[in-house]
């Protein structure tokens, strides 16, 4: 379990890989996933490395596969994903893959080009068909005398006087429907009203051959006189991207053309169907293998990218690599290298040699499907230094527990648990489906977090005795009313005249002792329920928050002990723990003391902790209305405040001064030159312990100059941040109380405003009404209390773990 509570022990290893076996060895190491390669060519340009051509070839294959995938998705063909993890192809197989992908890409491009040309011809013929159909209606209307009178205005008055025959030209075409109004105004203004426009809508939308979108269009015919107007009309049509088509003048010619167009449309439709069938077959065949192809190509690209990080021996027969790897996995890494050498057919084994280094290794925390989500929560705030305590195991308990304190409801916890259990039991099937829904994938990846949050919420709901805003009377209330009549001053007359009465726990028999588990259900109907729960939850939030913060500070002690840094213990951890304990730890003790020191008989004389805590910082003890909790309280509190104040310079000044003293001492004990001869003063045993180089530190101390100003600034920032953080974070933990109160109130409002209405119906149709009201209640419960309130509590729990 050591690797769970602290990051894995890492080592730097050097690999000697034979050129013919390097590809397979890196492939096996990649499948193992236990090593991190270092870049041994940092000064070499990316485009000048040895395997850059292979990387480019892989990128080109990846581009072709993305094109094929785009076409598959455009055709709405499901991509088959069996969850198979194919082996990486050998380098010699790259040519076959390239040829296969090139063939598929060229075939699809050719099909798309031909299909686009066919669709363009089909669109033109379809538009021509509608033009012939609509223009026939226009010409039939020309026989109307009213239309002739309207059209006669196109002639000059002088021509009408001479009795010249009416000779009008016309053009016909198709234009997008939304451009018709602007098109008509432009014609009227440019041609000064000397044209006659008729238009009719095409009922069915037409497919654009380029984009594949369906567009609504209209047929138009424009009558004019003279070549000048004809040229203007054609330029306007060209500007509005209208398609013009030849239209015969005689009905017989139009009829013959329409017949020919319909025949060509039928033939073209048949060719289009065959082309689409062929395209579907090609895409369906590609959809079966494209996921496997993607994995193969990307594995090859990753291998060649990794090989570019290696150095090449001068003999060009060996590749040298440096990797960080866990010490516990060295045997499996050796086995992977042997397996890669065997697959390549090489007779020379690969060599792994451990190296000594002062560089800080990377942090590696082993996870599984259960701990992965909690580790991600920790890493979202920051990844710890190498071999530091890993907070993730503790977060497995603290995170869902703090969430449950805010979300505590037995009923809602059961619902959340059932949802998480469903995802856990069906995780294999859900993983195999490879859902593209990002929101669902996010929720599913945190299924074990949700499971624990639901279980802890069920537990805290039982403590709060809250189930959908109602209490569970499992053991019977510990409060009794009868002693108030027999031993108290209650009577029937008092009940009739007094709307509100208060039970007196000081009377024997009224209060029978604490409830066996959780809060007594009698509080659910008490008028002072909110005041009681607020007091309880507020104090509980402060207690939990301070314990959580003290635990976080205590974890730093384990790091200081492990890294053998006594200076950080004496000048960091001890003043920090004293500062927090003397102020906020004392507050927790006061809370418990007040709970135990005052009972039902003396509770009326109990002083206010808030006033005492404020007066503690103000050194104000003249208020006689708020009496002391115990003897010697004033002296003890003054002592604690002074101790806390002394801890501030202890944290702020002591460490920089000690570090400066150690630096000057090392410098004095260092080497000196006398007449060109280097002479050194060897440190004593005590000094050697002080200046011992820590190989596990975050950086190498060799060659570093001590900067006193930087150290003082850093320590000042840390001290101010810690002191202010103790205050602000303690206040932040009050959100446990606030969100718990909000959740309980929302649950009560939802019950009162929704389900209570259905239960109050006493008519024959009450069951039917209750059915629909319960459906609304269930939907609102899931949407508001589970999703919205759950997400809010999750984010606040995350915030509290970041401040710990």
State where each predicted segment sits:
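Conserved, carboxylate-rich catalytic/transport cores that coordinate ions
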Residues: 2-11, 18-34, 182, 292, ...
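Long, charged N-terminal accessory/stalk domains
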Residues: 1-394, 399, 410-412, 423, ...
């Amino acid at each position: 379990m050591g690797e769970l509570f602290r990051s894995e022990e890492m080592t730097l290893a050097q690999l000697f890989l034979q050129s013919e076996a390097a590809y397979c060895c890196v492939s096996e190491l990649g499948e193992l996933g236990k090593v991190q390669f270092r870049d041994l060519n940092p000064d070499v340009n990316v485009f000048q490395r040895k395997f850059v051509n292979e990387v480019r070839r892989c990128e080109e294959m990846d581009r072709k596969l993305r094109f094929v995938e785009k076409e598959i998705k455009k055709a709405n063909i499901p991509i088959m994903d069996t969850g198979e993890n194919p082996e990486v192809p050998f380098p010699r197989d790259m040519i076959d893959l390239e040829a296969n992908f090139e063939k598929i890409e060229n075939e699809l491009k050719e099909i798309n080009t031909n299909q686009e040309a066919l669709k363009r011809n089909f669109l033109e013929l379809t538009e021509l068909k509608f033009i012939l159909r609509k223009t026939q209606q226009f010409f039939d209307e020309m026989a109307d005398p009213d239309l002739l009178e309207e059209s006669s205005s196109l002639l000059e008055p002088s021509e009408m006087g001479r009795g010249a025959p009416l000779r009008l030209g016309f053009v016909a075409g198709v234009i997008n429907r939304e451009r018709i109004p602007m098109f008509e105004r432009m014609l009227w203004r440019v041609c000064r009203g000397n044209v006659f426009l008729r238009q009719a809508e095409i009922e069915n939308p037409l497919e654009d051959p380029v984009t594949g979108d369906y567009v609504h269009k209209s047929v138009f015919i424009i009558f004019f006189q003279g070549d000048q107007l004809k040229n203007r009309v054609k330029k306007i049509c060209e500007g509005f991207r209208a398609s013009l088509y030849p239209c015969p003048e005689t009905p017989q010619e139009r009829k013959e053309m329409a017949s020919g167009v319909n025949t060509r449309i039928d033939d073209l439709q048949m060719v289009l169907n065959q082309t689409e069938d062929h395209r579907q077959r090609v895409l369906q065949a590609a959809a079966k293998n494209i996921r496997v192809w993607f994995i193969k190509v990307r594995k090859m690209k990753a291998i060649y990218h990794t090989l570019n990080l290696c150095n090449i021996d001068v003999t060009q027969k060996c590749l040298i690599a440096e990797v960080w790897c866990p010490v516990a996995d060295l045997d499996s890494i050796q086995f992977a290298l042997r397996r890669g050498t065997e697959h390549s057919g090489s007779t020379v084994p690969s060599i792994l040699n451990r190296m000594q280094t002062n560089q800080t290794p990377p942090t590696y925390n082993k996870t599984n499907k259960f701990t992965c989500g909690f580790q991600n929560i920790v890493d979202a705030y920051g990844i710890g230094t190498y071999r530091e305590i890993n907070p993730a195991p503790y977060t497995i308990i603290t995170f869902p527990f703090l969430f449950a304190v805010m979300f505590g409801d037995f009923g809602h916890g059961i619902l959340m648990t059932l949802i998480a259990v469903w995802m856990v039991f069906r995780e294999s099937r859900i993983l195999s489906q490879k859902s593209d829904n990002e929101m669902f994938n996010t929720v599913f990846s945190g299924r074990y977090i949700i499971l624990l949050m639901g279980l802890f919420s069920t537990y805290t709901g039982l403590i709060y005795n809250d189930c959908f805003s109602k209490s569970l009377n499992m053991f019977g209330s510990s409060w009794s009313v009868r002693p108030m009549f027999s031993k108290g001053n209650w009577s029937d007359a008092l009940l009739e005249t007094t709307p509100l009465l208060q039970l007196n726990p000081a009377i024997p028999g009224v209060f029978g002792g604490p409830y066996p588990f959780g809060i007594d259900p009698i509080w659910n109907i008490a008028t002072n329920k909110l005041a009681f729960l607020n007091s309880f939850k507020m104090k509980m939030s402060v207690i939990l928050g301070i314990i959580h913060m003290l635990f976080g500070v205590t974890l730093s002690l384990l790091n200081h002990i492990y890294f053998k840094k006594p200076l950080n213990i004496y000048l960091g951890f001890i003043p920090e723990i004293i500062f927090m304990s003397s102020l906020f730890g004392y507050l927790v003790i006061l809370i418990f003391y007040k709970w135990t020191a005052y009972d039902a008989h003396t509770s009326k004389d109990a002083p206010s902790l808030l006033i005492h805590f404020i007066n503690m910082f103000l050194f104000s003890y003249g208020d006689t209305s708020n009496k002391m909790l115990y003897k010697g309280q004033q002296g003890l509190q003054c002592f604690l405040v002074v101790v806390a104040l002394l801890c501030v310079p202890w944290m702020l000044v002591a460490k920089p001064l000690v570090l400066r003293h150690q630096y000057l001492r090392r410098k004095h004990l260092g080497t000196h030159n006398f007449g060109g001869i280097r002479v050194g003063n060897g440190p004593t045993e005590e000094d050697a312990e002080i200046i011992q180089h820590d190989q596990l530190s975050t950086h190498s101390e060799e060659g570093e100059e001590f900067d006193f100003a930087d150290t003082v600034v850093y320590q000042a920032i840390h001290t101010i941040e810690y002191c202010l953080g103790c205050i602000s974070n303690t206040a932040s933990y009050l959100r446990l109380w606030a969100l718990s109160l909000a959740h309980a109130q929302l649950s009560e409002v939802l019950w009162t405003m929704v389900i209570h209405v259905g239960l109050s119906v006493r008519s024959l149709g009450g069951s039917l009404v209750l059915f629909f009201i319960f459906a609304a209640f269930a939907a609102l419960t899931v949407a508001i209390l589970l999703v919205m309130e759950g997400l809010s509590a999750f984010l606040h729990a995350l915030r509290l773990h970041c401040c710990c």
